[in-house]
Curated annotation (Swiss-Prot):
Function: This protein is involved in the repair of mismatches in DNA. It is required for dam-dependent methyl-directed DNA mismatch repair. May act as a 'molecular matchmaker', a protein that promotes the formation of a stable complex between two or more DNA-binding proteins in an ATP-dependent manner without itself being part of a final effector complex.
Name of protein: DNA mismatch repair protein MutL
GO cellular component, one term: mismatch repair complex
Compositionally biased region (Polar residues): 348-359
Species this protein is from: Pseudoalteromonas translucida (strain TAC 125)
HAMAP family linked to this entry: DNA_mis_repair
Keywords, comma-separated and alphabetical: DNA damage, DNA repair
Classification via PANTHER family: DNA MISMATCH REPAIR PROTEIN MLH, PMS, MUTL, DNA MISMATCH REPAIR PROTEIN MLH1
Family membership noted in the UniProt record: Belongs to the DNA mismatch repair MutL/HexB family.
GO biological process, one term: mismatch repair
Lineage summary: Bacteria, Pseudomonadati, Pseudomonadota, Gammaproteobacteria, Alteromonadales
GO molecular function: ATP binding; ATP hydrolysis activity; ATP-dependent DNA damage sensor activity; mismatched DNA binding
SUPFAM superfamilies: ATPase domain of HSP90 chaperone/DNA topoisomerase II/histidine kinase (SSF55874), DNA mismatch repair protein MutL (SSF118116), Ribosomal protein S5 domain 2-like (SSF54211)
Disordered as annotated region, ranges: 348-400
Superkingdom of origin organism: Bacteria
Length: 618
């Protein structure tokens, strides 16, 4: 049998076996070409799951008339000029095979116009030798490619296509992935002349989380933790869901190119296994930016995998970038029971670390913090504390009217109506508004100073007497003032939301008391079988989260009837080491500058007999 050169159409059909697997493959190649052309608007029209029609329209740079013939030829591309370019690929496409391969297994027409041309032109290939025909056509700036009757001339390939619904689901998933790779591009997807997806361009980086919510779901955007690490030629940023979250969104990108790379997935899986022992990966959207010269994208027919020149370095970088977010969380929480922690001394050098970590620094994906932190809105299937009103659904507590409503609200002037209802249940105010100024003046005249000794212990003088006390006895009143000013105590966000499994009855019990927890600084998402803890009061941040929730559940069963009872409960469960933390030091400075703190401390203070100790010196 003699060796012969294959006809152009047959050669292209063989090449199409690698490039064109199904309609989604066609959409991928054509949309990537649009992105490479600088398009900011892309319209994707699908009919019958891509079996009948695939049409891609864009407003990109377009193709000049004299280049249309080359555009449908094999090994013709505008993205590579030399071997050096192959080692520094910044575009999504580069092989110059897609259009020729697609046109060999379908009826393809290419219409395009550059902004410098007065007229648009249309090209199509036909016949045994795939001769390209060009003719004028009416068309705006940009390019439109129509692919009709895919695999019409290869019956064996067409027979293996799935149902229209299945094929379109693959296209839909592909467009979701592309939408998260380019926030600055508007993308519209229609099926059988009905708009299915519409992603508007997000030119402001702070709006990126809105597209993440649109693609990955509202729960992902609310619960996802933003990650950012690295600098220079290797950076990582994105979002990761907590372990155990029911979300199948698992997208990875390398230089904005969609990836399903084994090395990347292995590093992510290993990070979660080492920290939490989780066998199943949570949802994530992770972007890796690397010097193009350090990665080979020409190792997979569909470009789904890459080869890093320093694979071990990249693997360890991804591993550590994720662990640096999760490990600090594990380190801050201990497994000691809640009651034991309250009596445990804490080293002065062991201070609470910032919950935001180091991953928010840097320039990559520099979104405002307010857009990245978990929001208070209600997530799908659960209640987010801080978002539901006191009289809302879900068994939330409803306060009963009280005769002292006006007096109480006069004192708590800054408290919202939702929170003020709790004070109507008999919350006692130790110092009235009318007496406040007089007390401050009187105490200021009699007080010298408050001297902090260690771990909340203090010494102060009042009315020419010396006393020893502990700042914890002034905490409740200080928290009262914060609620008066802010509406609630400020919670501290966990580095990674923690899931605590509970029975349905316990979840309902916690939901019934949710407005109290908002006042204290908790933020919980309550599901039917578990509670997701997103924030804890600053004074309880160092506790084991599971034990804290269990103790909170016990308090719900009591139940505590007013705000003072809840604040007293919180003070009793504040661990000793909190008084050595940076969080408390800031609160302590404010308390020391408040003249009323003296009166609060005197409730639980020991008088120091100076003369007795002076006699010891003689």
């Amino acid at each position: 049998m003699s060796i012969e050169i294959l006809p152009a159409r047959l050669a292209n059909q063989i090449a199409a076996g690698e490039v064109v697997e199904r309609p989604a493959s066609v959409v991928k190649e054509l949309v990537e070409n649009s992105l490479d052309a600088g398009a900011t608007r892309i319209q994707i029209d699908i009919e019958r799951g891509g079996h009948k029609l695939i049409r891609i329209r864009d407003n990109g740079a377009g193709i000049a008339q004299d280049e249309l013939t080359l555009a449908l030829s094999r090994h013709a591309t505008s993205k590579l000029k030399s071997l050096d370019d192959l080692e520094n690929i910044c575009s999504l496409g580069f092989r110059g095979e897609a259009l020729a391969s697609i046109s060999s297994v379908s009826r393809l027409t290419l219409s395009s116009k550059t902004k410098h041309q007065e007229a648009a032109w249309q090209a199509f290939a036909q016949g045994r030798d795939m001769a390209v025909q060009v003719k004028p056509v009416a068309h705006p700036d940009g390019t439109t490619i129509e692919v009709k009757d895919l695999f019409f001339n290869t019956p064996a390939r067409r027979k293996f296509l799935r149902t229209e619904k299945t094929e379109f689901s693959h296209i839909d998933e592909l467009i979701k992935r592309i939408a998260l790779s380019r926030f600055d591009v508007s993308i519209t997807l229609t099926h059988n002349e009905k708009v299915v997806r519409q992603y508007r361009a997000k030119t402001d980086p702070s709006q990126a989380i809105a597209r993440v919510a649109q693609v990955a779901g509202k729960a992902f955007a609310e619960q996802g933790l933003h990650i950012q690490s690295g600098e220079g030629g290797l950076q990582l940023h994105g979002w990761v869901l907590p372990v155990g979250s029911a979300n199948t969104v698992q997208y990875t990108y390398v230089n904005n190119r969609m990836m399903r790379d084994k090395l990347i997935l292995h590093a992510i899986r290993q990070a979660f296994e080492e920290v939490s022992g989780a066998q199943e990966l949570p949802g994530f959207v992770i972007y890796i930016d690397i010097d193009p010269r350090q990665v080979d994208v020409n190792v997979h027919p569909a470009k789904h995998e890459v080869r890093f020149h320093q694979g071990r370095l990249v693997h360890d970088f991804i591993l550590q970038a994720i662990k640096q977010v999760v490990v600090p969380l594990q380190g801050e929480f201990t497994n000691e029971p809640l009651n034991n922690l309250a009596d445990t001394a804490f080293s002065q050098t062991d201070t609470a670390r910032s919950p935001t970590g180091n991953f928010e620094s840097g320039e990559v994906f520099d979104y405002p913090k307010s857009q990245l932190q978990p929001s208070h809105s209600v997530s799908s299937g659960g209640a987010s504390l801080g978002s539901r009103s006191a009289g809302g659904s879900g068994g939330a507590y409803r306060a009963t009217p009280s005769t002292n409503h006006h007096d109480i609200n006069a004192f708590y002037q800054g408290v919202s109506e939702q929170h003020a209802a709790h004070f109507d249940q008999g919350a006692h105010v130790s110092v009235g508004v009318n007496q406040s100024h007089a007390v401050e003046q009187a105490v200021a005249l009699k007080t010298v100073a408050i001297i902090s000794i260690n771990e909340g212990v203090c010494v102060f003088s009042s009315e020419q007497q010396l006393y020893c006390s502990h700042f914890k006895y002034a905490l409740v009143d200080d928290w009262h003032e914060q609620i008066k000013e802010q509406g609630s105590l400020e919670g501290k966000a966990l580095l990674l939301p923690v899931r605590v499994n509970l029975s349905k009855q316990d979840c309902e019990l916690i939901a019934a008391q949710q407005s109290w927890f908002t006042l204290l600084g908790f933020e919980l998402i309550i599901e039917k079988q578990f509670v997701m803890v997103k924030k804890l009061p600053a004074c309880l941040y160092l506790l084991d989260v599971t034990s804290a929730v269990e103790s909170l559940l016990e308090a719900c069963k009591a139940p505590l009837e007013n705000i003072e009872s809840w604040l007293a409960w919180q003070m009793q469960h504040t661990p000793a080491r909190f008084y050595s933390s940076n969080i408390f030091l800031a609160q302590q400075a404010r308390m020391q500058n408040n003249p009323q703190t003296i009166e609060r401390l005197r409730v639980k203070a020991v008088k120091i007999d100076i003369e007795h100790y002076l006699m010891q010196l003689d």
